[in-house]
Amino acid sequence: ALTEVVRRYPNTRYAADARIKIDLVNDHLAGKEMQIGRYYQRAGRWLAAATRFRTVVETYQTTSHTPEALFRLVESSLQLGMPEEALKYAAVLGANYPGSKWYEKAYRLMQKHAPGVAVK
């Protein structure tokens, strides 16, 4: 319904309000995906966790949860024995969020667990 308001009446204050609400809903949905992914990580279900974090990166990439999701994908990939995949996520994290705490943590994690493919 909110996207319909934006589509039909793009230059109104209602559309602006609808865009804000859409962003808030997406951020909330991404937060729930993160919560479920973290639960799976704690349970040692790394593949299920990675699937949830990948959903955040692919579907909710404009939300505040994306940097953490990328970091969690680095963690999950390393746990699944895929250091090259972890490097890919760390590189995306470094390119898009170079000063973030999540990039710093990913960098240290890569150096510790996959020094042969460490992020530069």
Name each model-derived stretch.
Residues 1-120:
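Acidic, polar-rich low-complexity tracts and alpha-helical solenoid repeat scaffolds
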